Regions:
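Structured-RNA-binding interfaces characteristic of tRNA pseudouridine synthases
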Residues: 1-235
């Protein structure tokens, strides 16, 4: 599925705030007439978008996949779209069976009313070559305590980053990152830290010291949510 996260508090259901998960669940239940537990591959944060989110729900009822998808898209708001639906194995779990999650972050280097909603307008230059060199410090299995919120409920802060790279193309700078899992606010904090290191002419040791500190206050300021997309989930 795809969604524009601008008007939502994120994927996960919360009280007194619109969530992607709740919005889709409500529409499924209208069509199906039964209660469902919609499980997403991951919890995108408030304001974060998705190009390839995956979710599943279980039912004992017979469903015509084509008609169900068409009906669901017809009543979903315009900022949420179901791209594909298929029957999965009974034991499939979109969250726990996901091997890797991939995110992209978009920077625009010129002001455009058409890019503002889905990219971070950043007027200063970004040296992708130097940023890619700094990215090497994030690769592998590490403790990302310094790159997530202090009051997060997640006890295990170990994540394995397989790939992280920057690329410039047609007025946009794209950051791509792939890992087995991500913590709350982790991607945006990593990006903010990389930019901080670039602006202050820091080397890899700067990044290593942040990891060692295991304290969010040592990392850079998180970049805005509007440029971040859940790009793909790999199974």
């Amino acid at each position: 599925m795809q969604y524009d996260g601008t008007n939502y508090c994120g994927w996960q259901i919360q009280q007194n705030a619109p969530a992607i998960q709740q919005t889709i669940t409500d529409k499924i239940e209208i069509i199906s007439k039964f209660k469902v537990n919609l499980i997403g591959s991951g919890r995108t944060d408030s304001g974060v978008h998705a190009l390839g989110q995956v979710a599943n729900f279980k039912t004992e009822n017979e469903i015509n996949i084509y008609k169900f998808k068409h009906s669901l898209n017809a009543i979903l708001p315009n900022d949420i779209s179901i791209l594909e639906m298929e029957q999965a194995d009974e034991l499939f779990n979109a969250r726990f069976h996901a091997r890797r999650r991939c995110y992209i972050y978009l920077f625009s280097n010129f002001k455009s009313p058409f890019f503002q909603r889905y990219s971070y307008y950043y007027h200063e230059s970004l040296d992708c070559k130097l940023l890619n060199k700094l990215c090497l410090s994030f690769l592998g299995e590490k403790d990302f305590t310094s790159f997530t919120r202090k009051n997060t409920e997640t006890e295990n802060k170990i994540c394995n980053i397989y790939e992280a790279r920057w690329k410039e193309t047609k007025g946009l700078i794209i950051f791509y990152i792939e890992a087995d899992r991500f913590l709350h606010g982790m991607v945006r904090t990593i990006i903010g830290t990389l930019i901080k290191a670039l602006k202050e002419n820091c080397d890899e040791k700067f990044i290593e010291d942040i990891f060692s500190a295991k304290d969010r206050e040592f990392a850079g300021e998180a970049v805005p949510a509007n440029g971040l997309f859940l790009y793909k989930v790999k199974y």
